[in-house]
Structures are given as structure tokens and as C-alpha cells.
Amino acid sequence: GNWEHSNILRVKKPIDEFAVEKNIGVDELKKILINCNKKLLQERSKRIRPLLDDKIILGWNALMNTACSKAYCATGRDEYRQLAINNMNFMLSNLKGKDDNAYHHTFKEGKAKFPAFLDDYAFLIEALIFLQEITADKQWIEKAKLLTNHVIQNFIEEETGFFFYTPVDQQDIIVRKKEVYDSAVPSGNSVMAYN
């Protein structure tokens, strides 16, 4: 197919159907395709590889964790439940900050960096609540309560009751903003209200 003046290779029909149309044996066609793939990969290896952004983001992982819990509720498939538990254990142990309730925003190459934002905490708390619902293990709800208290202590604006996007002790910002409108994902304030 053609996309933005470039050719994108795609398969339009099953191999066996194409082989019959072209009067070629299926095994012979598979050998031809394997040889073509080798040539294409050789040419591709000559190109500069695109940059790879493989950092782990706390909020995004928490969103995925909630999705796994919901998938378990909908399907009863235990692999979703186990994935949610394993992912939560990873987040709680690898993204932990200077104290038990402070977390980092990203994790890459064995290092957690940057203080977590409001939405990171909000999505993490939400994921903990859903995880407690599917496991009946009270450790998750207890951690959600501790993190909620941490958010209230470190993010709240007393006059309005809204939460700032950054913690009170973050020094590398000029102005602390509040996000109160939802976009592609709900704002941290919306999720905290739901939690």
C-alpha cells in the first residue's frame, strides 16, 4: 500500500490462496518469502535505527494495572489478575522515592527518576483500589489510604480543595499549576475525586 508517498508492504490474502492463483506450491512460495524477508532485513540493517523511548511511567503503568483488574472482572481469566498483582509489586518496589509513600514518575535502566506528579499518584491509588476489589487483599486498600494521605499532605491547595500537579517540595518549577480539566485521560483532580 501507499502511505505518505512511501510503500508499506502488507499481505492482502492468505499465502495458500495466493499460491493457487499464481500456480506455485505453498512450500515453494514460503521459501521465496523467507528469502525476500532476509534481503529486506539486510537492507533495513543499513539504516539508522530510530530512537527508542523505553522508560516506564508510573501513571501509565497504573492505568494498565486498572485495565488488567477490569479485564479480570469481565473475563475471569486469572492471567489478568496475576499480571495486575505482579505489575503492582513492580511499581511499589521500583518506583519508590525517599520515603514509603513518595514515588517517582519514571523508571529506566534500574533507576527511578523525577518526583511523581498528581496523576501518577491518582492512577496508582485507583489501581490499588481495583486490585483490592479483585483480590480481597487488604494490603492494597491500606496502601491506597496511605498514598491518599500523602497526596493530601503534599499536593492540596487548602483554599480551593483542588490538588496541584506537583508536590509542595518540588524546587525546579516556577509556578505550581492545577489541572482540573480532563483530556485524553482524566485529570489527576478528577481521579482523586473518584478515588
Where would I find each of the regions flagged by the language model?
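Glycan-recognition and catalytic cores of secretory/periplasmic carbohydrate-active enzymes
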Residues: 1-195
